Curated annotation (Swiss-Prot):
This is Betaine aldehyde dehydrogenase. K(+) 2 binds at residues 250, 460, 463. Binds 2 potassium ions per subunit. K(+) 1 binds at residues 32-33, 99. Involved in the biosynthesis of the osmoprotectant glycine betaine. Catalyzes the irreversible oxidation of betaine aldehyde to the corresponding acid. It catalyses: betaine aldehyde + NAD(+) + H2O = glycine betaine + NADH + 2 H(+). Its cofactor is K(+). Dimer of dimers.
Amino acid sequence: MTIATPLKAQPKASHFIDGDYVEDNTGTPFESIFPATGEMIAKLHAATPAIVERAIASAKRAQKEWAAMSPMARGRILKRAADIMRERNDALSTLETLDTGKPIQETIVADPTSGADAFEFFGGIAPSALNGDYIPLGGDFAYTKRVPLGVCVGIGAWNYPQQIACWKAAPALVAGNAMVFKPSENTPLGALKIAEILIEAGLPKGLFNVIQGDRDTGPLLVNHPDVAKVSLTGSVPTGRKVAAAAAGHLKHVTMELGGKSPMIVFDDADIESAVGGAMLGNFYSSGQVCSNGTRVFVQKKAKARFLENLKRRTEAMILGDPLDYATHLGPLVSKAQQEKVLSYIEKGKAEGATLITGGGIPNNVAGEGAYVQPTVFADVTDDMTIAREEIFGPVMCVLDFDDEDEVLARANATEFGLAGGVFTADLARAHRVVDGLEAGTLWINTYNLCPVEIPFGGSKQSGFGRENSAAALEHYSELKTVYVSTGKVDAPY
């Protein structure tokens, strides 16, 4: 396979603050790499403490005037941003593919489009979703109102950089906050374009600032006294550190962390559909999706049919140039991630799992591309490393089970609780099983569909708080209660 050299994706500068690009060459330099070839497509600088201070000060200055605007006026700007994103979907999707290595056939339908949906949704509900309550108290009464928190920090992951930036910015902004957003150093480019588009849509300067950085930058943001809220998408270890730091200052937090989610296939399920769900829930974005159903529990009577169908369809997937619309599976985000995933595959083999297909680097790619074949293990047991730890790559574990009670107990025997799914023709059983699963986001007879109208988030070690839907506004605002007396104060002294 020969991959055409992509155009350079160098931004005007590393950071976007107060409505314009900003550079500080004293920051640590780092490269943005196209994962399909290993080629540098941009060179940027991590934020220095001075850049962090500048971004937060800019956000703080802009926030109060923004909060004083009506929700409808704020929402109008977000809806305009959604329109611009849709007009530029091709260019934004290509940039997302260069940034992440994900196939263009995915990014064109699932990345900037989802971000635009978030801006449109929150812009649309702004006039009504922030209303408070009227509480009659006899002659007196009280009312509540939702008020913004102030300056919020968003910290993104590298699997859906544009989507994550929008999922965090949309509820924060419509609630009257400002946001300083730090994308992953692996995928630094998309958020800068989102910032440009918001300014073009009419967002006042300073309300959405983007700064670059790595694990050393996060603490500067999280520990800043002017930051009221932190929203992180990332791994469980990172989430623990960020939550602990935020707790020291009693900051509001939303944690959207990792998972090892169960997908349960009963023997009465439509096997073709269940296999499709398992493939989407393990191989989409080369398996780099936090909610993936990487523990696929298949009832024993259906196991042979399931594996035969799965093997045939997996081996028909097209791996290759992510800029080619025919490609199903692109590279992982980096060589480091490739090495991590390959090491888990070796652990699966060593611990006795049966390798059904995949398990290595595909023959049709060479050089510096971070590719891994879509991999299926069968005969996996609950104690195997590949069944317990989040791999974040195209590795599916298929486990057997006999009955409903058994599979529920095993599915819940994990520290994670992000997601789960069930495939069955018996809808009564489907509802019973999802009620029993200890997870925040669940699907019946499908998997990994996340429209912005529904809340998304986890439980247990997979995080807390919710993104998307009107529920997200509760995490970017707080209630103010006002008691109104209609009479004189009756004091006993």
